[in-house]
Amino acid sequence: MLFTRQITQIFKKGITTFLFILIFALPLFAETAASNLTSSRYPISQTELKTSLDEIDKLLKAGSLLEAKTRYQTLIQYDLPKADRKTLRKALEDLNIRVLFSPIETSDSLPYTVQSGDALFKIAKKYNTTVELIKKSNHLDRDAIRSGMKLKISKAVYSIVVDVSNNMLKLFSDKELLKTYPVATGRTGHPTPIGSYTVVNKLVNPTWYKAGAVVSPDSPANILGTRWLGFSLSGYGIHGTTLPETIGSAASEGCIRMLNEDVEELFAIVPINTTVKIVD
């Protein structure tokens, strides 16, 4: 009996120890491990950050844009103060557009030799891109091309995600975030419709057809700005603005409103049938 009682006591102590570990020690260990992964896995000092940024600046001045982009992407993986991360992200996104609007070939572009009978609109249609993007990528100031010319053509699939909770539009190239833009979305009573749509038409200097009136592109009363990208949901789209102070707020009639310089950039990049996903 004494031996049995001793075994029982040992067993109970073992169970108590196991339960203590399960209830208290394991969560503490998991929390510590998670903290190490998120806050100290990739530490970097301000001195190291400044040195890296100076090196990137030298690369940019030397025209080594792709190497500079890679360095930015590496830096963003480090543990950084929120303000530094935001600055780096903006610099990377601006560089993304600079590379896109240059003749530098990337993994999502292809070289093309102009053939007899070619025209920019034919090439754009063939590769599901835009005339504007071909011109910007090859620094062309007119539509005329000649046989034998070498062109950089984008083969990326672009998509757009609009988050109405923070009034931000994200442009993706395949699955890589290319650039983030501030926007205005629907005000109270005129919400921006949540869902997935496609761009079905694109207009330069659009006419505004509002209830009971037609407002010409050159009228100060035309709030559509310089570009229109219409959705598969009739009456809705992405457009510019004559009210730049509203960007970043819920102020539109339900459409996605952008600064004119931003919508012109977006307009040049995305072709018809681009997917637009609106989330909250």
Summary of predicted features, one role per range:
Residues 155-242:
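Gly/Pro-biased beta-strand-loop elements
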Residues 74-107, 130-163, 279:
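Extracellular LysM carbohydrate-binding repeats and other cell-envelope/extracellular binding modules
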Residues 16-27:
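Bacterial N-terminal signal peptides
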Residues 41-66, 99-128:
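Primarily a LysM-type cell-wall glycan-binding module
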Residues 215-280:
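Exported/periplasmic cell-wall-interacting domains
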Residues 36-95:
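Alpha-helical, heptad-rich or low-complexity scaffold/stalk segments
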Residues 1-11:
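N-terminal secretory signal peptides that target proteins for export/translocation
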